[in-house]
Structures are given as structure tokens and as C-alpha cells.
């Protein structure tokens, strides 16, 4: 075959490919196919997994986690927190007032620690000293007692 024939055939192929009519007709768009193929699968999977999860949460009414446990025990009473914050300003972590020690022990029983304390009502700026004292006590003195 001559060089001119290769050029003509190549130009025709390039023209067909760039126009897109042959490509679109021959191959459907990949995104349409994958979206149609995956969507029903995701719905079925979500319905079965989500359904079990919803049933489990509805059966024990425990969606909120640590804050709900702490609130059920009455740990976050406003007047009590205000008094404890004032005590936190006056106490050191190595020599706690018994009320602060009891409060910190109640926080631990409610599965509150320095890394998840921001999920409780103690995340407000008013309780900064109380959070800092709890963090120091938890880090250095909790395990010793």
C-alpha cells in the first residue's frame, strides 16, 4: 500500500473518532452504565444493613452515646456544674475535693474521657477550668487511684 493510502485511511479514522458518532453509537457512556448497575445494589444493601441498624437502635433507645448515659445519671445538672466549676478553680488535680472526685468518677462510669468530653455539655467555654482539671486528673492521677 502506498503512503498516500495510509494517510487517507488514517484521516478517515481520525475524523470518525473525533466526530464521536461512531463511538457513541457503538459504546454507551460508562458513567450511565455504572450508575444504573450500582444504584439498585446500593439500595438493597442499604435497606438490609440500615434496617437492622434502625431496629437495633429503636430497641434500646441509645442513639446519642456517652452524653445520653451521663444525662440519665444526672451528671450534667446546671447548678451542680456551676458549683463544680468554682471548685475546679480552687483545687489541684493531685488534691481534689471529694465532690470533684465523685464527679470525675461518674464521668468515667459514663465513658467520658478527655478525647470525647466535647460531646457532652462540658464543651461550653464556661466549663473550661473543669475540663482542664478533668484532663489533668485523668491523665496523671486517675489510673493511680
Curated annotation (Swiss-Prot):
Pfam families: RXLR
Signal peptide: 1-21
Family in the record: Belongs to the RxLR effector family.
Function: Secreted effector that impairs both plant effector-triggered immunity and pathogen-associated molecular patterns (PAMP)-triggered immunity (PTI). Suppresses plant cell death as a part of the plant defense responses. Facilitates plant infection by altering the auxin content at the roots penetration points of the of the pathogen.
UniProt-recorded name of the protein: Secreted RxLR effector protein PSE1
InterPro entries: RXLR
Domain topic, free-text comment: The RxLR-dEER motif acts to carry the protein into the host cell cytoplasm through binding to cell surface phosphatidylinositol-3-phosphate.
Record keywords: Secreted, Signal, Virulence
GO CC, any one term: host cell
Organism: Phytophthora nicotianae (Potato buckeye rot agent)
Motif RxLR-dEER in this chain: 53-73
Source species, domain of life: Eukaryota
Subcellular location, principal: secreted
Induction (record text): Specifically expressed during the first hours of infection of the host plant. Expression is induced during the appressorium-mediated penetration of host roots and peaks during the penetration process. Expression then declines during early biotrophy, and becomes barely detectable during the invasive growth of the oomycete along the stele, and later during the necrotrophic phase of the infection.
Taxonomic lineage: Eukaryota, Sar, Stramenopiles, Oomycota, Peronosporales
Location in the cell: Secreted; Host cell
Amino acid at each position: 500500500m502506498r503512503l498516500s493510502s495510509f494517510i487517507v485511511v488514517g484521516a478517515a479514522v481520525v475524523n470518525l473518532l473525533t466526530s464521536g458518532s461512531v463511538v457513541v453509537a457503538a459504546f454507551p457512556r460508562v458513567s450511565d452504565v455504572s450508575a444504573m448497575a450500582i444504584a439498585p445494589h446500593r439500595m438493597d444493601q442499604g435497606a438490609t444493613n440500615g434496617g437492622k441498624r434502625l431496629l437495633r437502635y429503636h430497641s434500646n433507645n441509645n442513639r446519642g452515646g456517652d452524653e445520653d448515659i451521663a444525662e440519665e445519671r444526672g451528671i450534667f445538672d446546671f447548678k451542680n456544674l456551676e458549683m463544680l466549676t468554682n471548685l475546679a478553680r480552687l483545687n489541684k488535680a493531685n488534691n481534689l475535693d471529694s465532690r470533684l472526685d465523685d464527679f470525675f468518677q461518674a464521668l468515667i462510669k459514663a465513658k467520658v474521657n478527655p478525647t470525647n468530653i466535647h460531646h457532652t455539655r462540658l464543651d461550653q467555654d464556661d466549663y473550661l477550668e473543669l475540663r482542664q482539671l478533668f484532663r489533668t486528673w485523668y491523665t496523671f492521677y486517675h489510673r493511680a487511684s
